[in-house]
């Protein structure tokens, strides 16, 4: 079973990603992880932190000479701003005099839309700092690090690549054209908003500029595409084994994500059954389809079509023109605390959604095919693909 977790706070010394259950022999380097972390910092509308934030990647365990060893993998991402926060975020007790600085003032005015309020009440904190430090989307950098290993496994074992693009930002008209292919990823990353379509890009930029002028923030929708998946990852046998339920849970677990859909998702509910599904036809190598409304999943299993997962991100909760709240110490009306933030982080969210999709797909592949090494997993995959090909119905010549 592939398992992952992260540790660390937004302004702590470092973030740490742990990945357990990865087979031996998967090629991975610190440079590859750094490249994915750089993609996470992309996007028009990001705040000042992205300009000076540097992700210092250190492989702590589980990798030797560029290959995974089969044991737990630990990856550290250092915080270049740690010296500014060393007293405030020190794990050990510090002299109270050292804490007499502005950035350590108690944060008692929770931000609507954030974890501050519920976290303070649940854990008994009189300050939102312990909540916001862990709840921060900075934590996703560690997920991206772990997900880079999963991406490498999918590429080497199955020839599968995962990409994302932004569908819409704010009220911009959603892109509704064909899904991009992996060969389009470089052009997508070159777009200021990671859009596949130039006309959509211009509308998104206009939305961000308007929000910036108004002292506001924006959310949006991203789509992740994974092509080349074999038929049969996941299962129909129980809800927890359905791949769509696993994908939805993983993506919904990303900070600020408020909705997930597979394929055409909610739009499918508006259609009649006769035009909602992907009809099948005999082809030279088995079943073929002319549509992919299901997004590559039927009955909780991959069906050989490209996987399409969309995620809706809410507007960033830290609004420059602070929202109304209540001071948790005095009980009086107040305006929410304002931490340094972005106007829009939707382009970066796409990279994080890619990460979670890659981790779930890698787990599903390892559950299906097993193996202790990449070579063994590949052999198991080849055997399965041969068996599936034999079961495919042969196309009949029309009379």
UniProtKB/Swiss-Prot annotation:
Pathway: Metabolic intermediate biosynthesis; chorismate biosynthesis; chorismate from D-erythrose 4-phosphate and phosphoenolpyruvate: step 7/7. The keyword NADP applies. It is an enzyme of class 4 (lyase). It comes from the Bacteria. It catalyses: 5-O-(1-carboxyvinyl)-3-phosphoshikimate = chorismate + phosphate. One of its GO terms (cellular component) is cytosol. Reduced FMN (FMNH(2)). One of its GO terms (biological process) is amino acid biosynthetic process. Its cofactor is FMNH2. This is Chorismate synthase. It comes from Mycolicibacterium smegmatis (strain ATCC 700084 / mc(2)155).
